[in-house]
């Protein structure tokens, strides 16, 4: 009981901190029907600055880090992104009212990373004085791209297999899988895979993050990082949390249009995925000395669902998927649940490792 009590105390204490308070405040304003709005250009500007800040910090740390220290977490991030999509997509598709394509699109967003959630978790750890590897931000694109590409490829394969089954059953023709030049499996060829990778890398979130990482690695941006980005970080994050809270409440209405499976998945997936990330992070801690703060951030990245790079990527690559399903589940439920679960993963890391 003492273990459970310590976890509960940590969680309650974190809910009193500004990061989570602004998120809850935004949800309360939206629930009360407030007309408060933050212009879309302001939101995009805030996200851009936060991503550049995360990227610059990660790039500076990558420049100074041992490659071996980065390799393990990077591989773990890729594996987590792929595993979350495979498990989540096929689990969702088994539930009534959920198509294979919609399930994969939803799992793809949940396997990808939320910039706002990652920024919030960093702010919480910084506020508590908990150390973590500076290159953590560089893991974002590894997990994000792996999840989105896996989801799109599996969804395309599923669509092609369904068409083949229908055509074969009608007796009109029999299509064969493979055999084309450069073709990997049904409905997936190298050109398509290359296109998915390029589109994902060109998305606003990944582009800004990669730019920050590259500048951090090859330039000397410490002066502007410390004088401009670092001081603005917490203030901008508080506004972003307010926006995310209002957006989450507004998106909940979209879930009324789709199967109840998305509601259950949106509530449970962040916790389950975060526990998967915690398990992988704990293994890295014992094998490579990965820090307790790093374990928390890896858990939060696994728990988060993409709210910036993912939705437009899915809209473009899977136009047949239902946006009300995958955006409603991820932004309406997944993002707030992941942010509110930050204290849980902190408490677990403190109990198993010590922060």
Set out the residue ranges of the language-model regions.
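N-terminal signal-anchor transmembrane alpha-helix
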Residues: 12-25, 33-53
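Membrane-helix interface "capping/anchor" motifs
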Residues: 34-42, 93-102, 257
């Amino acid at each position: 009981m003492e273990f459970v009590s310590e976890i509960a105390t940590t969680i309650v204490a974190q809910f009193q901190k500004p990061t989570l308070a602004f998120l809850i405040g935004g949800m309360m304003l939206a629930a009360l029907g407030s007309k408060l709005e933050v212009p879309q250009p302001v939101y995009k500007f805030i996200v851009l600055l936060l991503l550049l800040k995360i990227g610059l910090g990660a790039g500076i740390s990558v420049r100074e880090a041992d490659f071996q220290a980065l390799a393990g977490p990077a591989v773990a991030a890729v594996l987590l992104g792929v595993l979350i999509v495979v498990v989540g997509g096929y689990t969702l598709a088994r539930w009534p009212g959920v198509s294979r394509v919609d399930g994969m699109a939803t799992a793809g967003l949940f396997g990808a990373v939320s910039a706002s959630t990652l920024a919030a978790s960093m702010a919480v750890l910084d506020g508590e004085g908990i150390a973590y590897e500076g290159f953590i931000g560089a893991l974002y694109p590894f997990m994000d791209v792996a999840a989105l590409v896996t989801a799109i490829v599996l969804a395309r394969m599923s669509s092609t297999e369904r068409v083949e089954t229908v055509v074969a059953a009608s007796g009109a023709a029999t299509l064969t899988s493979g055999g084309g030049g450069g073709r990997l499996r049904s409905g997936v060829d190298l050109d398509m895979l290359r296109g998915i990778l390029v589109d994902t890398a060109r998305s606003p979130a990944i582009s800004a993050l990669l730019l920050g990482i590259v500048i951090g690695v090859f330039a000397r941006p410490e002066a502007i990082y410390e004088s401009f980005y670092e001081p603005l970080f917490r203030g901008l994050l508080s506004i972003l949390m307010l926006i995310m809270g209002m957006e989450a409440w507004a998106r909940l209405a979209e879930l009324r249009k789709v199967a109840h499976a998305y509601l259950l998945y949106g509530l449970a997936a962040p916790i389950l995925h975060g526990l998967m990330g915690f398990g992988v992070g704990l293994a890295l801690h014992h094998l490579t000395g990965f820090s307790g703060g790093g374990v928390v951030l890896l858990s939060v990245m696994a728990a988060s669902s993409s709210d910036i790079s993912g939705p437009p990527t899915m809209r473009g690559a899977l136009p047949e998927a239902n946006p009300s399903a995958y955006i409603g589940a991820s932004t309406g439920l997944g993002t707030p649940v992941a942010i509110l679960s930050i204290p849980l993963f902190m408490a677990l890391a403190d109990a198993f490792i010590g922060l």
